[in-house]
Structure formats: C-alpha cells, structure tokens
C-alpha cells in the first residue's frame, strides 16, 4: 500500500518518524512531506505539497493550526483515506474530505499497525 506521511520529521522521537519506520517494516511504500529538509531511513522528506501518484492513505502529523490549504492538496491526491492521528483532529476538514468522497479516520497509525488494523 502506498502511504504519504504528512508532517514527516527527522527526529527519531517524533511519532511521524516512528510511523514511517513501522510502515516500512510492514512493507508499505512510503512518501514523506514535511517542512524541513532531510532524510528518514533513506527516504527524502519532500517540502511544499508535491503531487504523488496512487496514494492509498495519508496519515497526518500536523495540528489544525498547520492544516491551512490542506483540503485542496488532499483532494488533488485523491487518497482512499486520511488518518487524523491524535492532536490532528479537525472536524471541518474531515467533513469536507468526506463530502469529496475521501474516507477519514480519527485513529493512531502506530496502534493500527501494531494491531493489524491498518
């Protein structure tokens, strides 16, 4: 499955980094988007909002205050679902995505992976 981690970080103690590691361990193809340049486990963090083809799932690691302009980007990517990890919940964005036919889920990517529900 092709997954985009939005809010990627090079800091190994950040949940976005841990999620990237677990996604790779579970055999997923991972793309990273973040505000700072860098690499995570050999993957380059892309800046801005690059178009990435065939994304199944976007997992968010940015809070509502940093989600401005995200709706148009997510609609352009047209993923099957967007996971709102703890602290990223945004009912307005969730409703808009669902209206656009994109499934949303308030969940923890780490828990979903560890419990086989991803």
Regions found by a protein language model. Name each.
Residues 4-5:
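Conserved beta-strand elements of the Class I
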Residues 75-97:
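ADP-ribose/adenylate-binding Rossmann-like module
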Residues 39-72:
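Glycine-rich, highly charged phosphate/nucleotide-binding loops
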Residues 24, 98-99:
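Anion (oxyanion) recognition and catalysis
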Residues 8-12:
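N-terminal beta1-alpha1 ligand-phosphate binding loop
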Residues 13, 20-41:
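NAD(P)-binding Rossmann-fold cofactor-contacting core
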Residues 103-118:
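Active-site capping/gating segments
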Residues 32, 84, 104-107:
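General beta-strand structural signal in soluble alpha/beta enzymes
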């Amino acid at each position: 499955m092709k997954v985009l981690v939005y809010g990627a970080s090079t800091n190994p103690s950040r949940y976005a980094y841990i999620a990237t590691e677990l996604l790779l361990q579970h055999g997923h193809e991972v793309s990273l988007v973040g505000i700072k340049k860098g690499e995570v486990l050999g993957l380059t963090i892309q800046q801005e909002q690059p178009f990435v083809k065939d994304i199944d799932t976007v997992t968010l690691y940015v809070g509502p205050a940093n989600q401005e302009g995200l709706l148009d980007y997510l609609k352009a990517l047209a993923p099957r679902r967007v996971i709102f990890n703890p602290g990223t919940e945004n009912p307005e964005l969730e409703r808009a995505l669902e209206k656009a036919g994109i499934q949303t889920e308030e969940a923890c990517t780490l828990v979903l992976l560890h419990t086989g529900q991803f």
